[in-house]
């Protein structure tokens, strides 16, 4: 009787826990400074789009950017790392999902600077901007485009 009850309890736990394990989205490590408000807003954007975010406050996110082959010309204020790729700057979650699905041979993707209207930089106006695919040789080309006002 006790074994039968334990088996039912174990089955119930497995049915309860299994959906929770699948609920967590892809994990992205985000390297940012502790005082950057737009970085925190970008982290919130990722979370609201299904990503599990591990935020790390660092003195110089540029060190992480360089480690993953993203040159300063493509830099912004934070760097994410997911699936072996660097995600530099205010990249929309949809572009990250596309990267993970397509798995191009690249160092990562980047939104140089801090375009108004990009995730984490929301405001009354939106600039047009491109998410760049940064190749292993340091070159870059448009990967996704986002319209402005």
What are these regions (language model features)?
Residues 1-10:
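Bacterial N-terminal signal peptides that target proteins for export
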Residues 18-20:
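N-terminal signal peptide c-region/cleavage motif recognized by signal peptidases
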Residues 23-49:
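Local sequence-structure signature of Cys/Sec-based thiol-disulfide redox active-site neighborhoods
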Residues 27-28, 51-53, 83-86:
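Short active-site oxyanion
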Residues 35, 42, 57-60, 92-96:
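Stable alpha-helical elements in mature extracytoplasmic
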Residues 43-63:
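Conserved helix-turn-beta segment immediately C-terminal to the redox Cys motif
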Residues 67-149:
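Thiol/selenol-based redox catalytic cores and closely related redox-interacting motifs
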């Amino acid at each position: 009787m006790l074994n039968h009850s334990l088996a039912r309890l174990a089955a119930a736990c497995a049915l309860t826990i299994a959906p929770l394990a699948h609920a967590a989205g892809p994990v992205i490590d985000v390297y940012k400074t502790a005082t950057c408000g737009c970085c925190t807003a970008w982290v919130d954007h990722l979370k609201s789009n299904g990503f599990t975010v591990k935020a790390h406050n660092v003195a110089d996110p540029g060190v992480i950017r360089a480690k993953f082959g993203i040159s300063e010309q493509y830099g912004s204020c934070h760097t994410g790392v997911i699936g072996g790729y660097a995600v530099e700057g205010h990249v929309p979650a949809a572009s990250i999902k596309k990267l993970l699905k397509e798995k191009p041979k690249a160092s990562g993707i980047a939104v140089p600077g801090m375009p108004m209207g990009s995730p984490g930089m929301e405001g009354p106006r939106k600039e047009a901007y491109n998410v760049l695919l940064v190749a292993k040789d340091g070159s870059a080309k448009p990967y996704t485009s986002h319209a402005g006002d």
